[in-house]
Amino acid sequence: LQSQRKREEKNEGMMKCSLNDFDIADGGDRLNYDGGALREPMTGKGRYDLISPFALDRLAKWYEKGSKKYPQNNGRNWEMGMPFSRYMDSAKRHLNKFLMGETDEDHLAAAAWNIFAIMHHQERHETRWDDLPKYKKMEDVR
């Protein structure tokens, strides 16, 4: 019952389905294009157009393979969380295998997947999964 409640809370934000439920965000600034069209500047919104479609394709295929291997939570097993140390260990292992020339798996996509998973949990402020050591430089310790 408690897990069902958590799923319902998680999905509550996704239940909006009518345009009447949303406002259009407005930063106030406008760019005027030669044809007369107006649009907000892109600064600070990210440059999705710079993400390599090849890298994104490999990463998406890795997500697909993972969803088949771990079908729990409708293939979104990883979103349920695990310690960052587990993701980090796997990312480093896959990078090392790539550096050693191993080609049995897409080791770069696997490493990227693990790093993306950590970033996802960071953005959601899921600090309970952050079990990584907190190192400090000697100059910071003094």
Q: PLM features: what roles do these ranges have?
A:
Residues 1-142:
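Intrinsically disordered, low-complexity regulatory regions
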